[in-house]
Amino acid sequence: MSDTKNLNHDRQKALDNAISQIEKAFGRGAIMKLKQGAIEKIDSIPTGSIALDTALGIGGFPKGRIIEIFGPESSGKTTLALHVIAESQKKGGNCAFIDAEHALDIMYARKLGVNTGDLIVSQPDTGEQALHIVEYLICSGAIDVIVVDSVAALTPRAEIEGDMGDQHMGLQARLLSHALRKLTSIVSKANCILIFINQIRMKIGVVYGNPETTTGGNALKFYSSVRLDIRKVSAIKDKDVIIGNQTKVKVVKNKVAPPFKQVDFDIMYNEGISKVGEIIDMGVKLNIVEKAGSYYSYNSVRLGQGKENAKLYLKNNPSTADEIEQKIRASLQASDNDVSCFNAEVDSISDMDVPVF
């Protein structure tokens, strides 16, 4: 028994000496023990959607992590990223938008609540330049959210300087892989959120399984803590005029909470994510708002016939909307963030949706 104690004592002493040497070589904090009090709750920034914040498990995008938002064209990828910027700015955060596509609509960003006067915008000429700018901003330690729009537009310098028909196999994937190896650690230390918007391509010759894939190789799939698949489900019409889109978002990878949650919300033109529409949808799911046929009511007060009329009522009565929202948040908190109503169907999870850890 005494021999065992002596052995354990010697092992512990050797470990303490090793830790001491590591701290002398690399500084305090380079290595530590995760004691009971050392584990803290992951800080987050809201996405602008109550349902998506709940599905993510921690109330929004985790700080100090890399996020990927991908989907087809005009599905709401940039809109969601701009909402995150707006939410961060409300808390006094500094945000940057790396517009590699050279297509940022400043007027639309303002309508979503972005303070464009304080927004840092860059329109880089090459992929290398864009990623260097991202690195410098993160290393400043003063940035909270950086959005790169998009990965597909991060064109390597060799491709730009070459002829139009030249083949450059894997250049972009190698560029992104090299950059992410450097960025992943400094993003964590700076406690900022780095959001990559990505496009979808089709794999040639795929007979079985999902032919869709994202650009930039596999590195971003591995380094991302959260990956969101955003899709346009249907058009929202006012008579014959399309005024928005019903959007579906699936959390296909999540390192901070259980993945495979799925949410729906409305994205209205010139407005962004419809908060009142989401309040109605979640209120119905949680039995806070009553729905009988096409009529919506709350506390025996009829909100309107049809969802658009109910949304109009809540816009004109913000106190009622706030009251319903508070009840929704309280209900979700009381159920310990039980988001079983947002679970995606197993059959709908495609090959591309399987998370990469």
UniProtKB/Swiss-Prot annotation:
Q: Which GO terms describe its biological process?
A: DNA recombination; DNA repair; SOS response
Keywords for this entry? ATP-binding, Cytoplasm, DNA damage, DNA recombination, DNA repair, DNA-binding, Nucleotide-binding, SOS response
Task: Give the principal location in a single coarse category.
Answer: cytoplasm
* SMART domains the UniProt entry points to: AAA (SM00382)
Q: Which InterPro entries match?
A: AAA+_ATPase (IPR003593), DNA_recomb/repair_RecA (IPR013765), DNA_recomb/repair_RecA_CS (IPR020584), P-loop_NTPase (IPR027417), RecA-like_C (IPR049261), RecA-like_N (IPR049428), RecA_ATP-bd (IPR020588), RecA_C_sf (IPR023400)
Ligand binding (ATP): G71, P72, E73, S74, S75, G76, K77, T78
Task: Write down any Gene Ontology CC term.
Answer: cytosol
Q: Does the keyword ATP-binding apply?
A: yes
- State the compartments where it is located: Cytoplasm
PANTHER family according to UniProt: MITOCHONDRIAL DNA REPAIR PROTEIN RECA HOMOLOG-RELATED (PTHR45900:SF1), RECA (PTHR45900)
The entry sums up its family as follows:
Belongs to the RecA family.
NCBIfam families linked: tigrfam_recA (TIGR02012)
User: Any idea what this protein is called?
Assistant: Protein RecA
Tell me the name of the encoding gene: recA
